[in-house]
Amino acid sequence: SILKQELPLGKIIRLKYNRQVHKNEKGSILNFNMKQQTQNNPLGTEAVSGLMVKFAIPSIVAMLVGALYNIVDQLFIGQAVGTLGNAATNIAFPLTTSCLALALLFGIGGASCFNLTMGEGNREKAAYYIGNAVSMLFLCGLALCLITQFFLNSLLKFFGAPQDVLPYAQEYVRITALGFPFLLLTTGGGHLIRADGNPRMTMICNLTGAIINTVLDALFVMVFQMGMAGAALATVIGQVISAVIVICYLYHF
């Protein structure tokens, strides 16, 4: 399978992990909480009842917060642009759904491989799977971004965009497509972080991006009167910030 072929980022994370292990054998202490978390995964040590609460609540919050992106865009666009703008965001939603599907594919797949190898005590191979999953998330997001940019009009018409909505959808999607790699990294990376036993970090990643998106929506759409482009730009910036947090966490395996 794809995850069994070592990709560039997987090799980087694996080599970094080997250096950390070498340092630890000499008696050095890991200073980052992120690193300590990967060394003490609660999934194999804590009671199931406690884990249910620990994982369920942050996961539910993360899913609800993730839905805020579209809701917040709809609210501000409805006020500043009108019903045609709202229709444009709905026309574009199948592309977001495609991103979420790919994120589930590689995020849950990578998390499963990670947990299996961690259960075997093979930390080096676990880091290898994490790196490959992250690489595939980014590459698939980039591919979907390029496909969307090159075939934008055809895709929007296929999704049912009428002529009066098409210009708004084009303006919105051309910008939001730039965030597809980061959306995949955030969503798929969240599954990898949960597999490491830290669902709270996944919640923090999503919450941070949603707050930034809300603030920037108000600024770009209502204050600067940027319309569809402002809402799209706010969404992408929020996704980039969330993805950076995810990568910073995963890089310390």
What is each PLM-predicted segment?
Residues 68-71, 80-83, 117-120, 195-196, ...:
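Helix-loop interface residues and adjacent transmembrane-helix termini in multi-pass membrane transporters
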Residues 73, 110, 151-152, 189, ...:
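Hydrophobic/aromatic residues in alpha-helical transmembrane segments
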Residues 124, 137, 192-218, 229, ...:
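Alpha-helical transmembrane segments of multi-pass membrane transporters/permeases
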Residues 49-68, 72, 95-102, 178, ...:
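Residue-level signal for short hydrophobic patches within transmembrane helices
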Residues 98-101, 213-217, 243-247:
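Hydrophobic transmembrane alpha-helices of multi-pass small-molecule transporters
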Residues 86-146, 183-202:
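Small-residue-rich hydrophobic transmembrane alpha-helices
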Residues 77-97, 163-168, 228-231:
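Interfacial/gating helices of multi-pass transporter permease domains
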Residues 3, 11-56, 114-181, 223-253:
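Short alpha-helical transmembrane segments in multi-pass integral membrane proteins
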